[in-house]
Design a protein with these regions (language model features):
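Active-site-adjacent pocket-lining segments in enzyme domains
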Residues: 1-141
């Protein structure tokens, strides 16, 4: 297994990550194998269908972030089938975000309490998301 599984975002992720049963099963397997799971932008959509050992949604009750509904509207990409803020909330995640004049200029990184999921709000969060993941890896070694 891997130390880290990372889901990059981008608008294309809205068309496939949240619909893939194979990815959902892989995320669950990675989680139970001890991997740290990171995602930015639309990448967290790949987490919404992963299940725990009891069949419950794995991310329910966990702090997470991703692209905001406000940013989806600002970028005029409402035609995409899945929107991270909306879908993470539906999955029971505790959604957090920062806002600015335009959300595409904001950035925010969230680490869940267990330090197993590290999510970044948008493309501006990539560097800090990676740094946080590497810090968790270093502290656990």
């Amino acid at each position: 297994m891997y130390d880290i599984v990372f889901l990059a975002g981008g608008w294309g992720a809205a068309y496939d990550l949240g619909f893939s049963d194979t990815l959902a099963a892989g995320i669950s397997k990675a989680y139970y194998s001890g991997s740290i799971i990171g995602a930015i932008c639309h990448g967290p959509l790949g987490l919404i269908n992963s299940k725990d050992k009891n069949g419950n949604i794995l991310i329910a009750g966990r702090k997470m972030t991703g692209v905001t509904d406000k940013q989806v509207k600002e970028l005029n990409i409402t035609m995409t089938p899945l929107h991270p803020e909306e879908e993470l909330k539906k999955a029971g995640a505790l959604f957090e975000a920062k806002t600015k004049f335009l959300d595409q200029f904001a950035y925010h990184v969230v680490v869940d309490d267990e330090k197993r999921f590290v999510t970044g709000q948008n493309q501006n969060s990539g560097h800090e998301t990676a740094q946080r993941i590497m810090k968790i890896i270093a502290e656990s070694s």
